[in-house]
From Swiss-Prot:
<dbReference type="GO" id="GO:0005576">
    <property type="term" value="C:extracellular region"/>
</dbReference>
<feature type="region of interest" description="Disordered">
    <location>
        <begin position="44"/>
        <end position="67"/>
    </location>
</feature>
<dbReference type="GO" id="GO:0097484">
    <property type="term" value="P:dendrite extension"/>
</dbReference>
<dbReference type="GO" id="GO:0005730">
    <property type="term" value="C:nucleolus"/>
</dbReference>
<dbReference type="GO" id="GO:0005737">
    <property type="term" value="C:cytoplasm"/>
</dbReference>
<dbReference type="Pfam" id="PF10169">
    <property type="entry name" value="LLPH"/>
</dbReference>
<comment type="similarity">
    <text>Belongs to the learning-associated protein family.</text>
</comment>
<dbReference type="GO" id="GO:0007611">
    <property type="term" value="P:learning or memory"/>
</dbReference>
<dbReference type="InterPro" id="IPR018784">
    <property type="entry name" value="LLPH-like"/>
</dbReference>
<comment type="function">
    <text>May be involved in modulating long-term memory formation and retention, at least with respect to odor-taste associative learning.</text>
</comment>
<dbReference type="GO" id="GO:0003723">
    <property type="term" value="F:RNA binding"/>
</dbReference>
<dbReference type="GO" id="GO:0001099">
    <property type="term" value="F:basal RNA polymerase II transcription machinery binding"/>
</dbReference>
<feature type="region of interest" description="Disordered">
    <location>
        <begin position="95"/>
        <end position="121"/>
    </location>
</feature>
<feature type="compositionally biased region" description="Polar residues">
    <location>
        <begin position="45"/>
        <end position="64"/>
    </location>
</feature>
<keyword id="KW-0963">Cytoplasm</keyword>
<protein>
    <recommendedName>
        <fullName>18 kDa learning-associated protein of slug</fullName>
    </recommendedName>
</protein>
<keyword id="KW-0964">Secreted</keyword>
Length: 121
């Protein structure tokens, strides 16, 4: 397909804009380089060797036991709620709403003590 006049005009305008911003960008980069060369004398860089040695010495333990901070959540299989009454993170709001309706039906059925008269297949 051929390119339209509007498309060609937009391409030309983008090229002009690119050239215009290239000048500003070049000046900005030159300023950054000059500042970084001035700061190079002030800043002292650390080598990675001592840092890595510290990590390896801290990471290894002699007894070989691990400390576990997080306790496993206890979830009720029937209600799918944890001990605080919250649903799991992976469960979306629609599923939570559906689960609550299901639990309410069970509560009503349990309170009335009657079995529904609907035909069960």
């Amino acid at each position: 397909m051929a390119k339209g006049l509007r498309c060609k005009h937009r391409i030309r305008m983008r090229n002009i804009k690119r050239q215009h911003y290239a000048k500003k960008d070049l000046e900005r980069l030159k300023k950054i380089v000059s500042k970084s060369s001035e700061l190079k004398d002030v800043v002292t860089m650390k080598t990675t060797e001592p840092i890595q040695e510290n990590k390896t010495s801290e990471g290894t333990s002699t007894d070989g036991s691990m400390e576990v901070d997080k306790m496993a959540k206890v979830i009720n299989k029937k209600t799918l709620q944890d001990e605080n009454g919250h649903y799991p993170e992976w469960m979306n709001q629609r599923a939570v709403k559906k689960q609550k309706q299901k639990l309410n039906k069970l509560k009503i059925k349990k309170k009335s003590g009657k079995v529904s008269k609907a035909i069960k297949w």
